[in-house]
């Protein structure tokens, strides 16, 4: 497999970008980081078409609603801000966490927003309500909640206490799977049957959500200190990850073999990665504020 660098987006950022995401159509990209601004790009033209400024501290995560008309962002100022994409205005500002908010995620129909914080709590927000209070607080983590994903009826959370917690909304149950190192990234499959878990021991594991068994492991990257996210491609056959050695790594999901890796020019750390929803493209963010789109074939 060959990786081809297609585009470098003019990010304007001089500081680390902590999160980058394609929207559901893949026509637009949102990214944010330590500069406290969310930027929106048109992928085809490569132009930055809007900037959303309003956070008082670094932005650590963001997520879009299903139809891409709104997005939520969070970070060091302990607030979630829900933005109208077209007007650039903040529709809602949600507080309650006692420390920085590391991660946020909408469910499939964007009716629920989950937020995870350094305060070890997960808060669930009803997006159909005008309430500024969470509908539920999940207080099971013993340390910072670093990552959340939602698929089908499962809310899956990773914590620096080394535990993956899976909340089954239908059954009202909690299952816990312990990893020996802090968890930094969680990505659950569309069917909610397995999850991709990154942790601070330079390894990524594929976990069976039903049994809690580790099905596959992916090694070769460097991840010992920072949050470095991993993901699947759109067909969930390839595992992608950034790395603290300035590279992007790809593995075959089934046989665990490393397909390829490539060094990203000008950066020591690749912080985040987002795969295009329909094409064989992915975008990466770096600690030096760069955004690169790659094609794999």
Swiss-Prot record:
GO terms for cellular component: catalytic step 2 spliceosome; cytosol; nucleus; spliceosomal complex
Signal sequence coordinates: none
Keywords, in A-Z order: Cytoplasm, Nucleus, Repeat, WD repeat
Record bears the keyword Hydrolase: no
Mapped WD repeat ranges: 12-51, 54-93, 96-135, 140-177, 179-217, 222-261, 265-297
GO biological process: mRNA cis splicing, via spliceosome; mRNA splicing, via spliceosome
Top-level taxonomic group: Eukaryota
Cell compartments where the protein resides: Cytoplasm; Nucleus
InterPro entries to which the protein is assigned, alphabetical: G-protein_beta_WD-40_rep, WD40/YVTN_repeat-like_dom_sf, WD40_repeat_CS, WD40_repeat_dom_sf, WD40_rpt, WD_repeat_MORG1
Short name of any one Pfam family annotated for the protein: WD40
Entries under PANTHER family matching the protein: WD REPEAT DOMAIN-CONTAINING PROTEIN 83, WD40 REPEAT PROTEIN
Family: Belongs to the WD repeat MORG1 family.
Protein name (database record): Uncharacterized WD repeat-containing protein C713.05
Organism placement in taxonomy: Eukaryota, Fungi, Dikarya, Ascomycota, Taphrinomycotina
């Amino acid at each position: 497999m060959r990786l081809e660098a297609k585009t470098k987006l003019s990010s304007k950022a001089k500081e680390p970008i902590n999160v980058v995401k394609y929207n559901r159509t893949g026509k637009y990209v949102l990214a944010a980081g330590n500069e406290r601004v969310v930027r929106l790009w048109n992928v085809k033209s490569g132009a930055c078409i809007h900037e959303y400024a309003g956070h008082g501290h670094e932005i650590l995560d963001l997520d879009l609603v299903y139809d891409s008309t709104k997005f939520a962002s969070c970070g060091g100022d302990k607030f979630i801000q829900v933005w109208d994409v077209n007007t650039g205005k903040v529709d809602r500002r949600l507080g309650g966490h006692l420390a920085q908010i590391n991660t946020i995620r909408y469910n499939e129909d964007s009716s629920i927003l989950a937020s995870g914080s350094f305060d070890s709590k997960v808060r669930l927000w009803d997006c159909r309500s005008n309430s500024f209070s969470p509908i539920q607080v999940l207080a099971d983590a013993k340390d910072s909640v670093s990552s959340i994903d939602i698929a089908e009826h499962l809310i899956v959370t990773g914590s620096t206490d080394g535990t993956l917690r899976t909340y089954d909304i239908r059954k009202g149950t909690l299952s816990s799977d312990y990893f020996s190192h802090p968890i930094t990234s969680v990505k659950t499959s569309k069917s909610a049957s397995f999850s991709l878990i990154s942790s601070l021991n330079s390894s990524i594991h594929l976990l069976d959500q039903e049994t809690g068994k580790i099905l596959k492991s992916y090694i070769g990257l460097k991840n010992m200190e920072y949050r470095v996210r991993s993901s699947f491609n759109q067909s969930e056959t390839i595992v992608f990850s950034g790395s603290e050695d300035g590279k992007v790594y790809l593995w075959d999901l089934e046989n665990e073999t490393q397909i390829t890796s490539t060094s990203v020019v000008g950066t020591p750390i690749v912080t985040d990665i987002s795969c295009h929803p329909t094409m064989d493209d992915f975008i990466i963010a770096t600690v030096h504020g760069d955004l690169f789109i790659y094609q794999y074939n």
